[in-house]
């Protein structure tokens, strides 16, 4: 570091790398050849290795034991390269940097209290690139001997235990609920399997057997992530800023100004003067993900039970990969308080850059190009799985084969301009002269000045728009098939493949970033070579950037695929239950028939047998078997439970319909919005079978009634009981509950079981949002500023006016007056009774905004909705102002006053020296206080607010890791937590919250809601596993959320942050806040 009152250094070459040159007054650095102010590089690398080997006796996860060896190995390698910039700065004086040849400023800052001037033959100002790479691998292998239960009941019990364990380990509410339903239905299957064996005359030995198998299973996964993030240079002048590229007497090969991914700011004027070219460019932040996984295994063994001895073999294989890459731009910005002037001897290019000044003047010798840049984010993942097994009887029983295959794919593409390239002038206007051609590609020349102050004089003018697009697709294809004798270790339905044939989901959004020039004079001198009609150029610069945000949520779509798979498996279980019930009914019927065989039955059976076996004579045993089989088949078909029967087809249709809704708010969707879709799927699935169609609608009717009834499921299996569903199904089928036949009772039981499973698994994670049938939305608060009634009336009047083509300003003024009058009353309430404003008016105002956010499809349920987007915007603006007023003026002290008025809390208040003082002022001060533990610079963290996870979230996560023990980093995309210290049991979740969005500034309550959501997820964490790493609640001793917020977070927002901190304490979660400036 070089520090002095003033500094004047002259040399042939000057280099400042990762250092500081600071003076109170003037600084002048003069190099006869090259002057470089750049960064010092730092590199870090680390490797974490976890390896575990086990041998001997272990659990299988179900009811069984495993004898063999197990091995797990994970490696995590990281490498980080970062750059520490230099600083050249004068507190109160001028800064001049001069070079005879090249002047380079790289990832560094130059600050002048007064004027700042850079001069060189060529001047380059660029951004440093910080990079981080991580390679994570996980391997597991297991081989040995497995002893487990087999037989119809034994296999069912084993499946139920395994599935229940999976439900306990699942963190996502709805997935846990579906797993719980699977476990419960496995119990039903176990009971049924025993009933069927008993009906067939068997005992305990036929129900349960033992299987012994020798096998192996191994899996591996790899993931590599690479990130580069730029850290731009910054030039700041208290007065004027100038950059000049002289060309050094060789203008043919030099004389360029290049500024990339950097920020220039001057309180006065800014001037760029280049003998040749001026380039203002964006700098790219990049991320890349590559991953793959594979698994395979198999086993061979024998199963012994009352039904005989069987030899079986199983095999499975799976593989997948993912690819992701993204580019996100850091724009060059020039911000001048006075005039911005530019001269280039040849070309001037702005690509990913914004120039802002009160007045803009530019003289371009040849071509002027302005071009916006699109952020890009692409992702593609594929996964395939296949498994199969065969069981061959050695003695007794029957052969069986099962096959299962599935394939998933996720694909997403995102391309959109975020920050539009442009020249933005204030009241001084723009004056641009271009020697030859001006090209605007999705860029603007904008001015707030009167049209007579804006001129563009060019040889020719070209312009084009940029199309922004976001699209994603999610596909699932799969099925399973099992045939043959008794139920084996796989209890999925024989028709599972027909249940889960496939699913598709997707999304699409688009926008247009237009080229535009503000109103003013455009002169095209070379009309002969002008290609486009200038009249086609947009003059609306304020609405030119039709940017769109990302619409693909990878985790949500992956969970959607899991839900579809689980719904299909639940449906398969329900179909198996129905089929087994049909077998039980048929077996009882056949047994009864054998007790009362008539002579004509014997004659008919003999003819049937001999027709099926030409040339052979039937024995008495053959005839008896034929009588039994005929009675069995007739009863099974009449029961409706067989393949193609109305019960089976109705259940299949209901399952297919509900699968199509997977992933969203199932409770809300089922209660009416998707009724046409559901009806269409049912009709397609059941065809012309009215009984099947009616049964499918009965199942969905029961699920819908359950969802709309707001029953609190909370993910618990079995809460949605078949008894609860049965009355609705009986009613839908048009049957009398007092006169049901045995067959009808069995049908109701099977349909109720399916309805309970679907409702229980699907609504458990979202019952708080479920709509109560046709009355949905009618219970909203009816008193809002504008209250809901006023908002709806305003909406109708404005919509009718617009349709008539009249002048609608009078309508808007009328309702604004109503809003203003009610806002005046709010001011009085805030002054005289602020607590009332907090507990009543605030809820009322929020209700007004809530009605603007109701989706249009709710109108089909009888709910009132607003249709005019214009009216919605006005209500949101007016009510948002009142909400902001309430949050700023009342929430802090009112909440604290309520707290302090409790005698049990007054000791704490007195310890703060507040008792006996003005409680209102003290509370306001206390609740609105800044409770951050530290303040750090954004450049040291490497983050930028409001620019997405890549530029905001990930840098903060990396920064937090620098303060934690080496080796505590969890794998990328680990659930809930980012760091876990195995030595102490401490877990940390790193979060960043941009409080400066319009939504959070106008409604500070959103700050509390966002933090509370993170606290709840942290507090309720039970277990997560990824890439061979497992963390469960028993391993955790302390939980912490490390939160980053902008340094200019408002006092009202700090009130909400402090509320969240107190809430976290009650939940056992520590919230630590750091300000980032």
From Swiss-Prot:
A Gene Ontology MF term for this entry?
Answer: toxin activity
Q: Which UniProt keywords apply?
A: Hydrolase, Nuclease, Target cell cytoplasm, Toxin, Virulence
**Chain ranges for the short sequence motif VENN CT cleavage motif as given in the UniProt record:** 781-784
Q: Where is this region: Disordered?
A: 531-555
Asked whether the UniProt record includes Nuclease among its keywords, one would answer yes
EC no. given is 3.1.-.-
Query: Which EC class does it fall in?
Result: hydrolase
Question: Where along the chain is composition biased (Polar residues)?
Answer: 531-546
Q: Which cofactor does it need?
A: Zn(2+)
Query: Any idea what job this protein has?
Result: Toxic component of a toxin-immunity protein module, which functions as a cellular contact-dependent growth inhibition (CDI) system. CDI modules allow bacteria to communicate with and inhibit the growth of closely related neighboring bacteria in a contact-dependent fashion. The C-terminal 123 residues (954-1077) has DNase activity in the presence of Zn(2+), converting supercoiled DNA into open-circular form. Toxic activity is neutralized by coexpression of the cognate immunity protein CdiI-YPIII, but not by non-cognate immunity proteins from other toxin-immunity modules. The CdiA protein is thought to be exported from the cell through the central lumen of CdiB, the other half of its two-partner system (TPS). The TPS domain probably remains associated with CdiB while the FHA-1 domain forms an extended filament with the receptor-binding domain (RBD) at its extremity; in the secretion arrested state the C-terminus of the RBD and YP domains form a hairpin-like structure as the FHA-2, PT and CT domains are periplasmic. The YP domain is probably responsible for this arrest at the point where it re-enters the host cell periplasm.
Question: Assembly and partners?
Answer: Interacts with cognate immunity protein CdiI-YPIII, which blocks its toxic DNase activity.
Could you identify this protein by its name?
Deoxyribonuclease CdiA
User: Which source organism?
Assistant: Yersinia pseudotuberculosis serotype O:3 (strain YPIII)
Query: From which lineage does this chain's organism come?
Result: Bacteria, Pseudomonadati, Pseudomonadota, Gammaproteobacteria, Enterobacterales
The UniProt gene name for this protein comes to cdiA
């Amino acid at each position: 570091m070089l520090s002095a009152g003033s500094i004047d250094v002259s040399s042939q070459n000057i280099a400042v790398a990762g250092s500081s040159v600071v003076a109170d007054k003037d600084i002048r650095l003069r190099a006869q050849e090259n002057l470089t102010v750049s960064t010092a590089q730092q590199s870090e690398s680390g490797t974490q290795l976890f390896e575990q080997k086990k041998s001997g006796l272990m659990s299988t996860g179900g009811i069984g034991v495993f004898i063999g060896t197990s091995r797990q190995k994970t490696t995590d390698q990281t490498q980080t390269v970062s750059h520490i910039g230099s600083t050249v700065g004068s507190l109160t004086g001028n800064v001049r940097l001069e070079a005879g040849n090249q002047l380079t400023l790289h990832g560094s800052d130059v600050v002048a209290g007064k004027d700042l001037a850079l001069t060189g033959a060529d001047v380059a100002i660029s951004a440093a690139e910080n990079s981080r790479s991580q390679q994570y691998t996980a391997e597991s292998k297991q081989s040995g001997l497995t002893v487990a239960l087999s037989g119809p009941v034994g296999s069912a019990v084993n499946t139920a235990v395994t599935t229940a364990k999976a439900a306990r380990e699942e963190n996502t509410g709805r997935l846990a609920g579906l797993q719980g339903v699977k476990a419960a239905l496995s119990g039903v299957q176990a009971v049924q399997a025993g009933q069927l064996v008993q009906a067939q005359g068997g005992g305990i030995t036929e129900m349960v057997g033992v299987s012994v198998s020798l096998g192996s299973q191994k899996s591996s996964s790899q993931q590599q992530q690479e990130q580069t993030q730029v850290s731009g240079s910054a030039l700041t002048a208290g007065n004027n800023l100038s950059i000049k590229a002289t060309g050094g007497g060789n203008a043919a090969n030099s004389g360029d100004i290049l500024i990339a991914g950097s920020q220039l700011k001057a309180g006065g004027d800014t001037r760029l003067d280049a003998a040749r070219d001026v380039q203002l460019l964006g700098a790219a932040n990049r991320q890349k993900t590559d991953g793959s996984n594979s698994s395979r295994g198999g086993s061979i063994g024998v199963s012994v039970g009352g039904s005989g001895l069987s030899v079986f073999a199983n095999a499975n294989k799976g593989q997948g990969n993912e690819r992701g890459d993204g580019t996100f731009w850091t724009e060059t910005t020039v911000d001048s308080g006075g005039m911005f002037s530019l001269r280039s001897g040849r070309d001037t290019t702005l690509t990913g850059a914004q120039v802002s000044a009160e007045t803009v003047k530019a003289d371009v010798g040849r071509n002027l190009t302005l071009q916006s840049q699109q952020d890009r984010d692409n992702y593609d993942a594929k996964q395939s799985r296949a498994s199969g097994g065969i069981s061959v009887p050695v003695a007794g029983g029957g052969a069986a084969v099962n096959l299962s295959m599935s394939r998933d794919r996720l694909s997403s593409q995102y391309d959109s301009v975020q920050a539009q390239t442009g020249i933005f002038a204030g009241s001084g206007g723009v004056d641009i002269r271009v020697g030859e051609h001006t090209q605007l590609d999705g860029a603007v020349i904008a001015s707030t000045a009167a049209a007579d102050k804006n001129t563009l004089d060019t040889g020719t003018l070209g312009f084009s728009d940029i199309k922004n697009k976001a699209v994603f697709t999610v596909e699932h294809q799969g099925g399973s098939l099992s045939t043959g004798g008794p139920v084996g270790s796989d209890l999925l339905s024989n028709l599972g493949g027909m249940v889960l044939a496939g699913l598709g989901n997707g999304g699409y959004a688009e926008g247009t970033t237009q080229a535009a020039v503000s109103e003013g004079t455009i002169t095209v001198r070379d009309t002969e070579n002008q290609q486009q009609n200038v009249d086609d150029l947009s003059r609306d610069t304020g609405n030119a950037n039709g940017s769109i945000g990302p619409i693909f949520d990878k985790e949500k779509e992956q969970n959607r695929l899991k839900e579809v798979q689980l719904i299909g498996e639940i449906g398969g279980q329900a179909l198996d239950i129905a089929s087994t019930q049909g077998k039980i009914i048929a077996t009882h019927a056949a047994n009864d028939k054998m007790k009362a065989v008539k002579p004509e039955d014997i004659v008919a059976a003999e003819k049937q047998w001999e027709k099926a076996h030409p040339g052979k004579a039937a024995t008495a045993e053959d005839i008896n078997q034929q009588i039994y089989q005929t009675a069995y088949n007739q009863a099974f078909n009449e029961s409706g439970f067989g393949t193609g029967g109305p019960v089976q087809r109705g259940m299949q249709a209901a399952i297919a319909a509900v699968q199509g809704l997977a992933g969203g708010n199932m409770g809300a969707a089922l209660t009416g919005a998707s009724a046409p879709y559901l009806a269409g799927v049912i009709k397609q699935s059941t065809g012309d079978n009215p009984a099947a169609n009616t049964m499918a609608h009965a199942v969905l009717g029961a699920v819908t009634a359950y969802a709309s009834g707001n029953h609190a499921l909370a993910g618990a299996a079995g809460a949605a009981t078949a008894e609860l569903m049965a009355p609705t199904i009986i009613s839908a089928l048009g049957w009398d509950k007092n006169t049901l036949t045995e067959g009808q009772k069995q049908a109701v039981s099977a349909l109720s079981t399916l309805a309970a499973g679907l409702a229980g698994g699907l609504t458990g994670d979202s019952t708080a949002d479920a709509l109560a049938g046709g009355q949905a939305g009618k219970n909203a608060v009816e008193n809002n500023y504008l209250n809901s009634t006023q908002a709806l009336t305003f909406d109708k009047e404005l919509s009718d006016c617009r349709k008539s083509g009249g002048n609608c300003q009078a309508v808007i003024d009328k309702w604004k007056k109503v809003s203003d009058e009610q806002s005046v009353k709010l001011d009085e309430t805030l002054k005289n009774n602020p607590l009332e404003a907090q507990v009543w008016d605030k809820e009322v105002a929020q209700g007004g905004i809530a009605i603007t956010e109701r989706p249009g499809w709710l109108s089909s349920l009888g709910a009132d909705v607003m249709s005019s987007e214009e009216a919605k915007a006005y209500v949101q603006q007016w009510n948002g102002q009142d909400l902001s007023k309430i949050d700023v003026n009342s929430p802090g002290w009112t909440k604290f006053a309520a707290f302090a008025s409790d005698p049990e809390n007054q000791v704490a208040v007195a310890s703060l020296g507040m008792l006996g003082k003005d409680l209102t002022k003290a509370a306001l001060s206390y609740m609105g206080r800044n409770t951050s533990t530290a303040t750090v610079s954004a450049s040291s963290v490497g983050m930028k607010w409001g620019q997405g996870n890549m530029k905001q979230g990930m840098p903060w996560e990396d920064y937090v890791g620098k303060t934690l023990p080496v080796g505590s980093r969890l794998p990328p995309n680990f659930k809930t937590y980012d760091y876990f210290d195995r030595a102490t049991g401490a877990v940390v979740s790193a979060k960043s919250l941009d409080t400066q969005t319009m939504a959070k500034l106008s409604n500070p309550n959103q700050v509390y809601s966002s933090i509370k959501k993170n606290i709840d997820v942290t507090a309720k964490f039970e277990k997560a596993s990824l890439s061979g790493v497992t963390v469960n609640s028993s391993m955790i001793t302390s939980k912490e959320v490390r939160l980053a917020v902008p340094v200019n977070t408002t006092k009202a927002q700090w009130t909400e942050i402090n509320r969240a901190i107190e809430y976290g304490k009650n939940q056992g979660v520590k919230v630590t806040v750091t300000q980032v400036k």
